[in-house]
From Swiss-Prot:
EC number of this enzyme: 1.5.1.5, 3.5.4.9
Catalytic activity: (6R)-5,10-methylene-5,6,7,8-tetrahydrofolate + NADP(+) = (6R)-5,10-methenyltetrahydrofolate + NADPH; (6R)-5,10-methenyltetrahydrofolate + H2O = (6R)-10-formyltetrahydrofolate + H(+)
Subunit relationships: Homodimer.
Pathway membership: One-carbon metabolism; tetrahydrofolate interconversion
Organism: Picrophilus torridus (strain ATCC 700027 / DSM 9790 / JCM 10055 / NBRC 100828 / KAW 2/3)
Lineage: Archaea, Methanobacteriati, Thermoplasmatota, Thermoplasmata, Thermoplasmatales
Signal peptide coordinates: none
Binding positions for NADP(+) per the UniProt entry: 158-160, 183, 224
UniProt gene name: folD
Top-rank taxon, per record: Archaea
InterPro entries xrefs: Aminoacid_DH-like_N_sf, FolD_Thplmales, NAD(P)-bd_dom_sf, THF_DH/CycHdrlase, THF_DH/CycHdrlase_cat_dom, THF_DH/CycHdrlase_NAD-bd_dom
A Pfam family reported for this protein in Swiss-Prot or TrEMBL: THF_DHG_CYH_C
Name under which the protein is recorded: Bifunctional protein FolD
């Protein structure tokens, strides 16, 4: 089975659009700020995609772009936007050249943190509070919900604060059994072949080949790579798709769902601000 992330995203977009319409009918103009520093190709592409998606939802997404910025000036900018009643969500595109992202992201109030990367929002995952969660991790959970997978053994090949760590907690909150694998894990392919679900996010094209999979696997490919002028994932899609239970393609899998989940975070935070 090929899991269609575009369809999952479109279904959620309709619901979110209705929610935004209701909010706008109260006289509020939802607005989000994206801060982009440098000229990283992927960050530029993602920023423009978020602006287009926000426009479809009726959200004003404004891009602030800088060739470079000091840590002090970035913090001043974040504080100004954080204090503005007219700005309801803030995100910093990564990478941030010359600045430790985790050193500045906590300047954003938790309710305006559309990436879900402040210490407050990450910590809340441990308490089963997913009010605002990292969008990629939320997207994986959404995909499993969509295909009605409620339990099982999961191997996550990633331990980053963006994917592996928050996702492991969100899956534990749903009673999945989780194994987190990384560069020092021994015999990863034995772990993945015996798992019901494999989430791969290593940043290496075609990393997950047939030696890692079995016909019981559901493969969730979080990777986004560029190889020979084309976008591809971390899974060797063409060579494993017929040998697994189900798989998300790249593009058209996790990516569209992640992009939509950023705006679910935005709306959750906006509702919190409206309630005061």
């Amino acid at each position: 089975m090929i899991i269609d992330g575009v369809k999952i995203s479109e279904t959620k977009m309709e619901r979110l659009k209705n929610e935004i319409e209701k909010i706008k009918n109260t006289g509020i103009n939802p607005k989000m700020k994206i801060i982009l520093i440098g000229n990283d190709y992927g960050s530029v592409v993602y920023s423009k995609a978020k602006m287009r998606r926000g426009s479809k939802l009726g959200i004003d997404v404004d891009l602030d772009r800088y060739d470079s910025i000091s840590r002090e000036d970035l913090i001043k900018l974040l504080k100004r936007y954080s204090q503005s009643d007219d700005i309801h969500g803030i995100m910093i595109e990564t990478p941030v050249p010359g600045i430790n992202y985790y050193d500045v992201v906590n300047e954003i109030p938790f309710y305006k943190d559309v990436d879900g990367m402040t210490s407050y929002n990450l910590g809340n995952l441990y308490l089963k509070n997913e009010f605002i969660a990292p969008a990629t991790a939320r997207a994986v959970v959404d995909i499993l919900d969509y295909i009605n997978i409620k339990s099982g053994n999961v191997a996550i090949i990633n331990r980053s604060p963006v994917v592996g760590r928050p996702l492991s907690m969100m899956l534990l909150n749903r009673d999945f059994t989780v194994t987190v694998c990384h560069s020092r894990t021994v015999n990863i392919n034995e772990i993945t072949r015996s798992s019901d679900i494999v989430v791969v996010a290593v940043g290496k094209p075609n990393f997950l080949d047939r030696s890692y999979v079995s016909d019981k696997n559901i493969i969730i490919d979080v990777g986004i790579n560029y190889l020979n002028g084309k976008t591809c994932g971390d899974a060797d899609y063409e060579n494993i798709k017929d040998y697994v239970n189900a798989i998300t393609p790249v593009p058209g899998g996790v990516g569209p769902v992640t992009a939509t989940d950023i705006f679910e975070n935005f709306i959750n935070g906006l509702k919190y601000q409206i309630k005061g």
